[in-house]
Regions:
Chain B
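Polyanion-binding surfaces on beta-sheet-dominated domains and ring/shell assemblies
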Residues: 1-258
């Protein structure tokens, strides 16, 4: 259990057409991105998204162990998602639990769908995601950070991975749920896409949505992802500019 | 992937280019589903043995008494565990649940939990005491599509489940209070992409040829979705998978409830 | 603890010369056997014995890991005995406990004593036993199922393994204890033999038996094993007939 | 088995054909048994250090307070653990108890439990509180036949055990209520088959040559038996092993109690 | 050690022979220390992000309610855990805390515990209920000397920590009773020996060249010491390290408290 | 927690200038040493020190696993410190805990500083320490026993390792704390030295000591270690004499 939910089931999540934190239905929380933030990784990124704080870093391509599981046709990309004990209000015991195993898998799957792994046969590429503060939507924040770190590492990618969740609260479809909305809402739909082609790389849902609500929510998540994509591109571009400027100094 | 697996995959893919499946099923056709409810009824309050083609899964329900979650002090608790037993495939190893087993367990769990299939509010006993429904999925023969078999088995076993008698702080084994209150029948349908086609209920050969997959669990609404595995869908493919999943779930629901 | 035992210590287990389920002292419970029941194993068997339901299957001979533990003179046969969580009234936590480790070992030892392992040096043969419903005597049921599965797999065997338990209830020696008799009885004596030569392959005992009671109980268990042997032979024979008939179709 | 082990095995087996043992013992003769009760008496309520030939085992008893089993609410609890410490043999690895340690622990446990050696009914304290006797067997030097050494050590340590004082819900360390109530002295005797002979108390060389083994634990009746290892016995051999076990147990019991 | 590491080590050592460090610091000079208290303040009662040169460590404090130790029924409890996250170095592996992480955690813990930095007597709530302070050190980028970074981070985070409100047996999340009572500021200083010199705050290159190391944690007295690693100190070197540690701790304490 | 400490905080540890067990401030507890006490090790030792009873034994030099962690320049020496469940008043759960992992490491470090490991490249030397009864100061007792066992094994050593703790009780600096002094004292300072050169091999401290108290305590621990060294030398010498005498018989 990530956090204890309070027993107030009839909490109103929409008041006067606005969400609890004053956002419109299609409005994202505040987002800050940065790459190249760690010294010991070949690529790294830091993303603040609402109250979420997530760090991602890449080691590799490097020797894959155990030997007999190596793939002679491509690198094996493994993402490890980890929450700091103090990232949630009720301390999380250190170490992987079932939830983090699942999130690690779906992020690994999404990144592996766009990275050109064929370039590095027999190796392993390890992407580490550290959730330093969690406030709903960590899997989308994590995949965005991981994708930035991977791009920053120089591993060639067919496309970036952008992600955003939508959901249903008080019967309305909204984008990018924060903690209270996630706890008391009726549905969560995280989506990750390769923004240039529009392919779906990650799609999960739990709650309840009619066929029509799904379409609306899906489109809202994709629209959110596209906004994220613009920020990701700018972040990577800025880092290159800084890099060039830094070199000239 | 060894050479035999590669050849199978190749054969499945080339057939699929002509719109044909290796066992001649239609793209949206399930293999035969056989459900034996009450398989372990001498010991387990609920159980169901599922044959999905030659995939075999046994699901058992245990009912225990424990503490509620602090945030829902008057609601029962449910938990889902999947064991990919090594007997089921030479490819499974012994040991603790791994990535694949955990993912299947969590997708099955979400379908049941989010649809409210178990009326957890009726599982309150007294202060700090509620019923815990343990859903244990035991995979015995992996002929493909164990996720759907597990999901069909879980809700079938729940429908079979009796609530034990509880008196003076003690569970009376072998005596029953009535049935476990079940409100609806969520059914997961897994759609796999092979070439430019989507098919349901992949057999083992089709799983070798699978590019990626999407599971959609429905009641009268969508309750859970999970894209799984490397590979991509277009949003049109996702829409198609949702349509198919509603349709097939309806058919399967009749078998489960029937 | 496999199951909670009720506190009724003075429960009568023999009434009017009959056991609780109406059996005579030397009478086995109902037994049903089948082989070739799984698709992914090289050999498999299913046995219902009273309220016990047990499935066994064999993978291998196949590469043995880790390499440095391979035996260049023969295959290493490993049996893994596992109880489903719901096979007993009080849910058993999944995973091996000390009891199942011991039972796995004694079954491995018994099967290894009759299988011609020298034929497959450097390999491993893995026998998996799944207890789907448990009602006393599972180790005998398991060894009978495992032996059928191994025979069904084509691994050559010097003999089958037949097994049956006897015990003492209300001071009387009886064969094949069911749950209540096992819980409130005074002794349990599971025996496995190679039925043609009469060799003892497995022998365990706990409780209390005088020297004479032991002899009586041992003989009863061997007699039970011999009945089991006849059923095992018939089961294997029937499967071959079916196989031939199936082939002719 | 390396070449040295093979030669030892061969030598033991060929001697045995003439009815002789490598250390000139009679077939039913144990090595010297030395028992030092109270070895760890400054900390442990009961203990015994056993030398069985050059096999060394230290057994300690800890007494804790805990809940009874629900089906025996007025009986104490016992539990047996065996640690094959890596110091005892270059062949033991570090780590959690393995197959062999578990089997030894369970055979030792059954002998004590089934004979009723510990009068568990006298270990009741108050509602939901009983004494738990932890029997911890620490194997320090494996010169062969650690099972019998462990079993002899366990009952010796139990006979040495004092029951701590318990007042107002607290165990008073270092003060004692009396002795742990012990009713009898179960003794395991392990018979190994080498060629056509049965011998007791195998040393390490004899264990290499061992075909299979049978442990019989007796008081005035048989309380536990365990055939262990690949290989077979005839029923006559089993009978012989039982006779020998009764006889040797009687001799050893005098050493333990004496 | 690969060839690159060997060359670095060699370079560091030869510079040191001239009394120089690879980054031109004085022997007793720390790299720049940046402390951001309250980094995770939206969720954690206390936290601090430490940059020690390019070493990065995040420490979070969680406050839970639990049982006191039986021997100190009216005192709160503290516990320290260090996670060497694999993101921090290609040399760290995933998995449970290992030798190195445990040693660091225990040295950090001893400094805080033995100095009485947390006034545990003020963490009593009611019978059998006390506050537990969980100190979780998350190492994110290992540029050398993570022990000192962890120790500085731990006490900084404790100084940042608010005590949650506790009413009617429930912790009120997001409401605070006041600050966690902290009595002093223990600071660990790690002295490493390279050739015949002692230096503080080794960077990664200097750690390759390190012969052995001594950590001294001080307040106005010495509270903890730990020699770590293969290699030896003379007693004069130990004395020098203690002097240096008192001096540097004083400077660092001002940064922490400032 | 090794043992439950009683709540008597104001217990007097020094009465009339004497310690609770009658010792002077600079007096060691009774000590007994022996080597060559086990048959299956290449070297072994047994040390009784006050109420502590500790056994140490050495296996190796032998193949080191896993292969990729071998050191081609020297042997890897690993000490494993283990407390028997019954060695303390409140039963310790079997298996390594964080405390024993740390003690294992500091003993490994100290022994590795004097053993000539370069003689055995690519191998492992395993030193096992079994605490059979514990009564404060077990890490010093263990290192003394381990050093004797290593010397007894024939692995060449530049020097022995001698060790002794000092500490502060009732404000006074004393040597070699026993249990009550350790529990209610103000400080513990275990020291291990190579006695011929006087090098410090192990140094730990917890509690509180002023600069001057430290010097006094350190010197007292070193003096204790030197006494231990004399006993260690005598023990090794006696064992050689016995060995020669034994050979002549």
């Amino acid at each position: 259990m990530e956090e204890i939910k309070m027993a107030e089931k009839d909490m109103k999540l929409i008041v006067n057409g606005k969400r609890l934190d004053g956002r419109n239905f299609d409005e994202l929380r505040k987002i800050k991105m940065e790459v190249n933030v760690l010294e010991r990784t070949v690529g790294s990124a830091y993303v603040e998204w609402g109250n979420n704080k997530v760090l991602a870093g890449v080691h590799g391509p490097r020797e894959f162990h155990p030997k007999f599981l190596r793939d002679p046709t491509k690198a094996i990309l493994t993402c490890t998602y980890n929450m700091a004990a103090f990232s949630v209000e009720d301390r999380k015991r250190p170490g992987p639990d079932r939830r983090s195993v699942e999130i690690s898998k779906v992020i690994s799957d999404a990144l592996s769908s766009v990275a050109v792994l064929e370039k590095y046969p027999n190796t392993g590429i390890d992407v580490f995601v550290e959730v330093l503060q969690a406030d709903a939507g960590t899997r989308c924040v994590s995949i965005v950070a991981a994708s930035l770190a991977l791009a920053n590492s120089g591993v060639p990618m067919k496309d970036l991975v952008s992600a955003c969740a939508s959901g249903k609260i008080d019967g309305e479809i909204v984008v990018d749920l924060m903690k209270e909305e996630d706890n008391y809402g009726e549905c969560d739909l995280p989506v990750a896409i390769s923004p240039r082609k529009g392919d779906v790389l990650l799609l999960q849902m739990d709650g309840n949505l009619t066929r029509d609500e799904y379409t609306k929510a899906y489109n809202m998540a994709v629209d959110g992802s596209k906004k994220i994509y613009e920020m990701q591109k700018k972040t990577l571009l800025d880092s290159m500019v800084n890099f060039v400027e830094g070199e000239q100094k | 992937m060894n050479i035999e697996e590669y050849l199978r995959k190749d054969y499945v893919t080339s057939l699929m280019r002509e719109g044909r499946r290796i066992d001649n099923r239609k793209l949206d056709e399930f293999r035969e589903i056989k459900i034996e409810k009450g398989y372990s009824s001498e010991k387990a309050p609920g159980s169901a043995f599922i044959n999905l083609g030659d995939t075999k899964v046994l699901v058992g329900i245990s009912m225990g008494v424990g503490e509620p979650y602090p945030d829902r002090p008057t609601s029962g608790v449910m938990t889902t565990n999947v064991e990919l037993r090594p007997i089921a495939s030479p490819l499974f190893e012994s040991g603790p649940p791994r990535e694949k087993a955990i993912e299947i367990a969590r997708v099955v769990d979400r379908g049941i939990r989010e649809s409210g299939a178990i009326d957890l509010d009726k599982l309150y006993i007294e202060e700090d005491k509620v019923w815990i429904a343990f859903i244990d999925v035991h995979v015995l023969d992996d002929g493909g599509n164990i996720l759907d078999a597990a999901g069909i088995g879980a809700i079938s076993a729940l429908l079979d489940t009796r609530l034990p008698k509880y008196e003076d702080g003690v569970v009376i084994r072998g005596e029953w209070e009535g049935k476990l209150p079940i409100t609806c029948t969520p059914v997961p349908v897994t759609n796999v992409k092979i070439g430019s086609n989507l098919v349901v209920d992949p057999n083992l050969d089709e799983e070798y040829a699978r590019e990626t997959q999407l599971t959609v669990t429905t009641t009268d609404v969508i309750n859970a979705m999970q894209k799984s595995g490397i590979g991509v869908f277009s949003s049109e493919e996702v829409d198609e998978a949702i349509e198919t999943s509603f349709k097939k779930a309806k058919e399967i629901r009749e078998i489960i409830e029937g």
